[in-house]
């Protein structure tokens, strides 16, 4: 992590509610007004506890906050973190490069037939990846690429 993350009182309240409902500690909370969702980052190995049996914890949390709730499993390795973010079953490789100007760039390789799923409706998954990559690892851009198609830069 390049810098300390500052949380608002609303975000801290949301994290406290998350912990009370799920029993898992949220590492971070991002409120995405544009997509009407709340994204919680949980520590490695705590996804099952956070989700609950049959998604029970997430459903009750969504009912309480009246928004979609999304979870991401944190990892110290930026490539693994991005893979967790964008559905690691659909990703073949993640490369982190440093450009000549010193900024970092992530290149995510996916099967061309699955690219739409990885990017998400209206680019919501790609936007989440860009936001969290910047927040945790100071990665300026995330490229979702497939071997046979053109690169999509975010």
Predicted regions mapped to residue ranges:
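RNA-contacting regions in translation and RNA-metabolism proteins
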Residues: 1-154
